[in-house]
Amino acid sequence: MSRYMNPSYRSLKPYVPGEIPRDRTFIKLNTNESPYPPSPGVIAAFTADNAKLQRLYSDPASIDLDRAIAGAVRVRQENIMATGGSDEALELAFMAYAADGIAFADETYGFYRVLADLHDLDTRIIPLRDDFSLNPEDDYNLGRMIVIANPNAPTGLYLKPDVIEDIIRHNPDHVVVIDEAYVDFGNESVIPLIHKYDNLLVTQTFSKSRSLAGARIGFAAGNAALIEDLERLRNSRNPYDISRQSQLAGVKAVEDAAYYRDLCVRIVRTREWTMRQLKALGFTGTDSCANFVFVKHPDFPGEVIAQKLREKGFLIRHFNKERIKDYNRITIGTEEEMEALVEALREITGHDKNS
């Protein structure tokens, strides 16, 4: 670190992304990307927007993309703001609404803590129960902004809309942000509640269910006044946050919703199959409602499982945190990838069919 670094940031602990392999080929099950390609319409959008157009700035308001998303989730365009991934929407919310502080679970998306530290926010950590479920009453009347990942990461646990609504009702003077990065895997969104509660902000991403992690597309949904707040901040820091090609691809992804719904059904089916196989090998875990499983084995530390799988050509996500150090988060890949993973785990745990 240089001597010129702002003292406010010298102790900052940046977010640590999942490993991106560069020197060999792995089956990559560590960052919850879709194992399937984008829809044909999206692929065509990427090839159609030729190099000549790249000399022009993208639409800073992302009007076409906002309109498409609004139609898909059945709200007015004024209730939607497309962003450069849902992480941008989350950061803008932290900037806009956490003057009194921020609250989130002890085991959740690690970027929340990074954003809180980056913006020097008064942070309250809400401990989850022993089974990693959230006690809704722990989020009542906190006097600060609340952010909840639903389904949660890395646990995959899901809170039904009536539970979320109860939390919103008990925090009428502060914004409640619901991060729905994994909502498409068989769960119900709370976006319809934005018409009932002016303090509800919902974020989603195109990185998981829509096979567009590399395009960096997300959005925020909320009361028109909340969206105006976020737009004011966005346009004060990075008005051209979504590239031309990403905006075109995002519109096509929304139009090709049936293609992505089928992929989500396929991923959920593979997730359930994978969990049955892992239980047969002695693993236990949460009842995940996302595109990953969160599991541990009684005889092998989580770090050992992750390392042995890496040696066999698989990348999964191990978190070096005391409470979850025995667990690993494993992204659901294709059927063939998960069959190969289960076979590798049979060998690691001593359940090899040939032994």
Please report, for each region that a protein language model flagged, where it lies by residue.
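N-terminal "arm"/small-domain region of PLP-dependent enzymes with the aminotransferase-like
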Residues: 1-56, 142
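PLP-dependent aminotransferase class I/II
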Residues: 61, 199-279, 283-286
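Phosphate-binding glycine-rich loop
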Residues: 63-101, 119, 299
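Short acidic capping loops at alpha-helix termini that bridge into adjacent secondary structure
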Residues: 76-80, 101, 180, 198-199, ...
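PLP-dependent aminotransferase-like
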Residues: 95-149
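Active-site phosphate-binding strand-loop segment of PLP-dependent enzymes
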Residues: 128-184
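PLP-dependent enzyme catalytic core of the Aspartate aminotransferase-like
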Residues: 162, 308-312, 317, 321-355
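Conserved PLP-binding catalytic core of the aspartate aminotransferase-like
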Residues: 268, 280-312, 328
